[in-house]
From Swiss-Prot:
The keyword Zinc-finger applies. GO terms for molecular function: ATP binding; heat shock protein binding; unfolded protein binding; zinc ion binding. Participates actively in the response to hyperosmotic and heat shock by preventing the aggregation of stress-denatured proteins and by disaggregating proteins, also in an autonomous, DnaK-independent fashion. Unfolded proteins bind initially to DnaJ; upon interaction with the DnaJ-bound protein, DnaK hydrolyzes its bound ATP, resulting in the formation of a stable complex. GrpE releases ADP from DnaK; ATP binding to DnaK triggers the release of the substrate protein, thus completing the reaction cycle. Keywords: Chaperone, Cytoplasm, DNA replication, Metal-binding, Repeat, Stress response, Zinc, Zinc-finger. It holds the Pfam family DnaJ. Zn(2+) 1 binds at C148, C151, C201, C204. GO terms for biological process: chaperone cofactor-dependent protein refolding; DNA replication; protein refolding; response to heat. The J domain is necessary and sufficient to stimulate DnaK ATPase activity. Zinc center 1 plays an important role in the autonomous, DnaK-independent chaperone activity of DnaJ. Zinc center 2 is essential for interaction with DnaK and for DnaJ activity. NCBIfam families: DnaJ_bact, PRK10767.1. This is Chaperone protein DnaJ.
Length: 379
C-alpha cells in the first residue's frame, strides 16, 4: 500500500512554515495519542504516520529531500528517475540532500516541486486622528497580479493542461555527473517548474496570472496608530501557474493633529486661560474628540499645571481600557491693551508690590535666592 503524502498527513500546505508544521503536529499528536484512543489500532497507526511525517518535515534537509524525491528518498534501494548519469541507489542515507555523493547519477524519484506563492504587497494609508480612533471603512485600489481567468491560472490554453517535464520527470532539477561527483542543476527544459506547457494561454502568455488594479474594501479597526498593519490574507500577488497568492498588508500612518498629541492610549493638549481665570478660578471649555466638556480651574492656578480628564483619551486596538486626556493650562499674557487697561494693571502691581511675598511666593523666593548667591560670592 502506498504511503500518504506527508503534507496531507499533517494537514498542511506544501509551503507551510516550520511554525505551522509544529502546530499541526501538536494538534494531531494530541488527538491520536495512544493514551487517548483507548487501544484503537487504526488511530494508533495514524499516530505513527503523523510522527513519521513530522520527523521528516521538521528537518530542513529531510524535507528538501522529500520535496525533491518523495518517499523514494527514504526507501532502501530507491531510484532517482532520469536526468543524466547512469542511474543508481539514493536510498541509503538522505541526511545529505545530495544522497550518496559517490552513488549513481540518476536524478529524481516521485517528489514534486513546491509551488512558489505570490509576493506579499504593502499599501500605505494615511488617516486623521479622528478616523484612527473611531475606525473607518475604505476602498483602496491596488496594482497587482491576479489569476488569469481564461486559463484558470494554469497558464495552459483552455482545453489543454501542463505536462510533466520529460527531462526531470517533474522534479524541477536534474543531476549531472562531473567526474566522481553528482551535481544538481535546475532543469533546463522546464526552468525548475517540473511541468511544461505546450499550448500557452494567449491572455497570460503561459504565466497563469495577469496585471490588474484591484479595488478592495478595507475596514480599519478603531484605535489603530501609526505603524499598525492590517493583513488581508490572499490579497497579494497571485503566484504563477495557479500557485497561492501572497498577502496584502495595509500600513497605517496617522497625521499630526492641530490640537492633540497621542501617546499610546492617552491624548495631550494645551489649553490657554486668561490671567484673571488663573488668579480667581473659573470654568473653561476643553476640546475632546467627542466634543467640548467643562473643566473647573481652581483659583491661583499656575501656568503648566496638568489636568486629567479620565476616559477622554483613546481606546487602543490592543486594549480594552480607554486612556485619559491630559490638559496643560497655559496662562496667556494680555496683548493690545488700551491705555485704561494698562493703567489698571499698573495700579494692581502697585497694590501688590507691598506684599509681594504673599502674592508672588515663587518670584520672591527666586530673587531671595539670587541675592543670597551674590552675597556668598562676596564673603
Amino acid at each position: 500500500m502506498s504511503k500518504r503524502d506527508y503534507y496531507e498527513t499533517l494537514e498542511v500546505s506544501q509551503d507551510a512554515s516550520e511554525k505551522e508544521i509544529k502546530k499541526a503536529y501538536k494538534k494531531l499528536a494530541m488527538k491520536y495519542h495512544p493514551d487517548r484512543t483507548q487501544g484503537d489500532k487504526s488511530k494508533e497507526e495514524t499516530f505513527k504516520e503523523v510522527k513519521e511525517a513530522y520527523e521528516i518535515l521538521n528537518d530542513d534537509q529531510k524535507r528538501a529531500a522529500y520535496d525533491q524525491y518523495g518517499h523514494a528518498a527514504f526507501e532502501q534501494g530507491g531510484h532517482g528517475g532520469g536526468g543524466g548519469g547512469h542511474g543508481g541507489g539514493f536510498g541509503q542515507d538522505f541526511g545529505d540532500i545530495f544522497g550518496d555523493i559517490f552513488g549513481g547519477g540518476g536524478g529524481g524519484g516521485r517528489g514534486r516541486q513546491r509551488q512558489q506563492r505570490g509576493s506579499d504587497l504593502r499599501y500605505n494609508v494615511e488617516l486623521s486622528l479622528e478616523d484612527a480612533v473611531k475606525g473607518k471603512s475604505l476602498e483602496i485600489k491596488v496594482p497587482t497580479y491576479v489569476s488569469c481567468e481564461p486559463c484558470d491560472g494554469s497558464g495552459a490554453k483552455k482545453g489543454t493542461s501542463a505536462k510533466t517535464c520529460s527531462t526531470c520527470h517533474g522534479h524541477g532539477q536534474v543531476q549531472m555527473r562531473q567526474g566522481l561527483f553528482a551535481v544538481q542543476q535546475t532543469c533546463p527544459t522546464c526552468s525548475g517548474k517540473g511541468k511544461v506547457i505546450a499550448d500557452k494561454c494567449t491572455s497570460c502568455r503561459g504565466q497563469g496570472r495577469v496585471e490588474k488594479t484591484k479595488t478592495l474594501s478595507v475596514k480599519i479597526p478603531a484605535g489603530v496608530d501609526t505603524g499598525d498593519r492590517i493583513r488581508l490574507s490572499g490579497e497579494g500577488e497571485a503566484g504563477e501557474h495557479g500557485a497561492p497568492a501572497g498577502d496584502l498588508y495595509v500600513q497605517v500612518n496617522v497625521r499630526d493633529h492641530d490640537i492633540f498629541v497621542r501617546d499610546e492610549n492617552h491624548l495631550y493638549c494645551e489649553v490657554p486661560i486668561s490671567f484673571v481665570t488663573a488668579s480667581l478660578g473659573g470654568e473653561i471649555e476643553v476640546p475632546t474628540l467627542g466634543g467640548k466638556v467643562k473643566l473647573k480651574v481652581p483659583k491661583e492656578t499656575q501656568t503648566g499645571k496638568m489636568f486629567r480628564l479620565r476616559g477622554k483619551g483613546v481606546k487602543s486596538v490592543r486594549s480594552t481600557s480607554t486612556g485619559d486626556l491630559m490638559c496643560k493650562v497655559v496662562i496667556e499674557t494680555p496683548v493690545n491693551l488700551s491705555g485704561d487697561q494698562a493703567d489698571l494693571l499698573r495700579q494692581l502691581e502697585e497694590k501688590m508690590a507691598s506684599s509681594s511675598k504673599k502674592h508672588s511666593p515663587k518670584e520672591t523666593g527666586f530673587f531671595d535666592g539670587v541675592k543670597k548667591f551674590f552675597d556668598d560670592l562676596k564673603s
